[in-house]
Amino acid sequence: MAAPWLQRWRGAYAGPSGPLRLVRLHGVQRSSWRAAHAAAGAFGAGPHPGPPQRAANPGPGPHPPPVATSREKHARIVQGRPDQPAEPKVLRISIIGAPNSGKSTLSNQLLGRKVFPVSKKVHTTRCKARGVITHEDTQLIILDTPGLTSPMKAKRHKLEAAMLTDPWDSMKHADLVLVLVDVSDHWTRNSLSLEVLKCLSQFPHIPSVLVLNKVDLLKKKIILLGLINELTEGIVNGKKLKVRSEFEYNSSSPAKTVLKVTQTPPPENRARESPCQLETDKAQEGSSLDNSSDVKASESSLDTEAREQKPYKYGDQKNRKGWPHFQDIFMLAALNGEEVDTLKQYLLMQAKPGPWEFHSRVLTSQSPHEICDNIIREKILEYLPLEVPYGVTQVTELWEEGPSGELIIVQNLVVPRKSHKLMLIGRRGALISRIAQEAGQDLMNIFLCDIRLKLKVEVKS
Ligand SMILES: Nc1nc2c(ncn2[C@@H]2O[C@H](COP(=O)(O)OP(=O)(O)OP(=O)(O)O)[C@@H](O)[C@H]2O)c(=O)[nH]1
Ligand SMILES: [Mg+2]
C-alpha cells in the first residue's frame, strides 16, 4: 500500500483572521477500475467471466451510475429533465494543463469510473467531454479537455481544430478551473506553459486551483516546495507565501515529515499574520529525507516575504513563469488515487446553489459509441508508434444486444498501409487480441454488462 505521505495545502485556511489548522491527510486505496485482464481469443474478446453486477436501481449513491449501451437511451437520459433536489448545488470544473499532465486520469478518478481515454502518448484526448458527479444535493460537472497546445504545434502534428479551441471553450462554462502540472517532467514543471498562462489571463475572474500531479514519481518530495513557489510566483489567495520545511523524527511515534507553509498577509494585514501548517507522514521510500536520528532540522527555507511582489500584467505572459492568483494548491497522484478524494471533497464544498444540469443517472455526456471509439483508440495509442494510431479510421459495423443480454460490438480498423495492418495485428494476432481484450474489459466496467468486442483490421482500398 502506498505510504500515506501526501498532503494538501489550502490557502483558505490561512485567511488574515483565519484559524491555524494542522492538516493531516491520508492517501486513498488504489482504484479498482484497472482490472486484471484474462487471456483472449485471437482477434476478439469473448464474454468476460464475472462482470460487475448492474445495480438493481442505478442512480445517486456511493457508486457511479453505468453508461447506457444504447445511443438513444443514453441521449434520453442526458437530455432528460434533471431530478433536482430541494436545494440543488452545482459546480462546473474545467481541467486544463499541458498534454499528458494527467487530466483524464484525474477526471476518471474523480468520477469513480473510467470513461475518458488515458495513455502515455500526448494528445490522447481529442475534444472536450463532460463527466458528472452527483453527490447528495451537489452536482459537479467535470470538463476534461485536450492538452493545451500552440497553433504551431497543432499544425505540425496535424491536430484537429477542436484540440486548440476546446480548452478555451470549456473555460467559458467553468465556475472553477483546475490547472494540472506534471511534477515528474523536469523540462516543464518549473513554469506554467504559455498556453496555460494565456488561458488563465483570458479568464482571470474564474477561481483557479493549482494541482501538482504525479507526485508519486518524485524521489525528492522537497522540490515540491520550490515548485509551488515558482508556479504561484510566491502568492496564493492574495497572500505571499513563506515556504519552509522541517523534518522531524520522533522515536516514540512513527517518523514523519512536517512541511510548513507560512503565508504573509498583504502589508496592511501584517499585524494579523497567520501561518498555515501542513503535516504529512514521512516521505516514501527513495526520498532523500534523513530520518535516521532523533533530530529536528530545518532542511530548506524559501522565504518569499522579502521578494518584491510584481503586479501581474495580463498579456505579459511571455516573461512569467507562474500565476499569482491561485486560490488553493493540491498535491496528488491521480494514477493511484492518492489525495483525489480530498480534492473531491474540496470541490463539493465549492459548489454554489444552482440547478443541476443533468439527471443524477448521467455519468458522462459522451455517447456509448464515442466512449467505445476512445477506449479502443487509447489501446492503439498505448501499444503502437504514433504514426499508426494517427492513421487509423474506426468504423463500427455492429452494435447490438446479444441473446444473453451481452453487448456485441464489431469494429473495423481501417489503416492506410499494409505495414500498419501487420503492426496492428501483431505476431499471430497477439496485439489485436490484447487490444480487444483490454478495451472489452474497460467497456464492461463502463457499461456494467458483458461485452463481446471483435476488432478487424483492413487496409484502405
Ligand atoms: N505515475 C503517475 N502517472 C500518472 C499520474 N497521472 C497520470 N499518469 C499517467 O500519465 C499519462 C498521461 O495521462 P492522461 O490522463 O492521458 O493525461 P492527459 O493530460 O489527459 O493527456 P492528453 O489528453 O494527451 O492531454 C498516462 O500514462 C497516465 O497513466 C500519476 O499521478 N502518477
Ligand atoms: Mg486526456
UniProtKB/Swiss-Prot annotation:
The main location is mitochondrion
Where is the region G3?
144-147
| Stretches with biased composition (Polar residues) | 285-303
Record's Gene3D superfamilies?
3.30.300.20, P-loop containing nucleotide triphosphate hydrolases
Q: Which InterPro entries match?
A: G_ERA_dom, GTP-bd, GTPase_Era-like, KH_dom-like_a/b, KH_dom_type_2, KH_sf_prok-type, P-loop_NTPase, Small_GTP-bd
Q: How does it sit in the membrane?
A: Peripheral membrane protein
Top-rank taxon, per record: Eukaryota
Region G4: start and end of each range? 213-216
Q: Which GO cellular component does the record give, naming just one?
A: mitochondrial matrix
Q: Where is the KH type-2 domain?
A: 380-461
Which residue stretches belong to region G1?
Answer: 97-104
Q: Please list the residues that bind GTP.
A: 97-104, 144-148, 213-216
Name of the protein this chain belongs to: GTPase Era, mitochondrial
The source organism is Gallus gallus (Chicken)
